Curated annotation (Swiss-Prot):
CDD domains noted in UniProt: Complex1_LYR_LYRM7
Quaternary structure note: Interacts with RIP1.
GO molecular function, one term: protein folding chaperone
Highest classification ranks of the organism: Eukaryota, Fungi, Dikarya, Ascomycota, Pezizomycotina
Cell compartment(s), UniProt: Mitochondrion matrix
GO cellular component, one term: mitochondrial matrix
GO BP annotations listed: mitochondrial respiratory chain complex III assembly
Stated name of the protein: Mitochondrial zinc maintenance protein 1, mitochondrial
Major localization class: mitochondrion
Keyword terms: Chaperone, Mitochondrion, Transit peptide
Record organism: Phaeosphaeria nodorum (strain SN15 / ATCC MYA-4574 / FGSC 10173)
Positions with biased composition (Basic and acidic residues): 90-100
Function statement: Assembly factor required for Rieske Fe-S protein RIP1 incorporation into the cytochrome b-c1 (CIII) complex. Functions as a chaperone, binding to this subunit within the mitochondrial matrix and stabilizing it prior to its translocation and insertion into the late CIII dimeric intermediate within the mitochondrial inner membrane. Modulates the mitochondrial matrix zinc pool.
InterPro entries assigned to the protein according to its UniProt record, in alphabetical order: Complex1_LYR_LYRM7, MZM1/LYRM7
Length: 115
C-alpha cells in the first residue's frame, strides 16, 4: 500500500512541477532532479512508519503549493514590467482580509518610547 502511495505522490509532484515550470526547461529539470533525489533518499523508509506518512504528506503539500502558488513571470519591457503566466490551477484570493481592514491604518498612531 505505501509503495503505491509513494508512487502517486511522486507522480503528482512531477505533474505539479510541469504545470508550475512550463516552458522553463532548466527549472523544470532541476525540480524533477530534486524530487527524484528526495524520493531516493527516503526509499529505505518502512511501510506504515510515521516518518513515511510525514514524508508523503510533505510531498502532497509541496505539490499543492507548486500547482497553486508558483507563477512564472517574464520581463515584458525595459521599464520593469512583467507578464505573468497564470494558469487554471493558480489560486486566486478574494482579498477579504484586506477589505476588512480598509481605512484602519495603525501606522502613526502608536507612540514608541513616550509616556
Amino acid at each position: 500500500m505505501s509503495r503505491e502511495m509513494a508512487l502517486v505522490a511522486y507522480r503528482n509532484l512531477l505533474r505539479s512541477a510541469r504545470v508550475a515550470f512550463q516552458g522553463d526547461m532548466n527549472t523544470l529539470f532541476a525540480a524533477r532532479a530534486e524530487v527524484r533525489r528526495n524520493f531516493e533518499s527516503n526509499r529505505s523508509l518502512t511501510a506504515g512508519s510515521d516518518e513515511l506518512s510525514k514524508q508523503l504528506t510533505h510531498a502532497e503539500e509541496v505539490a499543492k503549493f507548486l500547482r497553486e502558488n508558483v507563477v512564472q513571470g517574464q520581463a515584458a519591457d525595459d521599464e520593469g514590467s512583467y507578464k505573468l503566466r497564470i494558469h487554471e490551477h493558480t489560486e486566486r484570493g478574494n482579498n477579504e482580509d484586506i477589505r476588512k481592514g480598509k481605512g484602519k491604518s495603525t501606522l502613526g498612531r502608536v507612540k514608541c518610547c513616550s509616556s
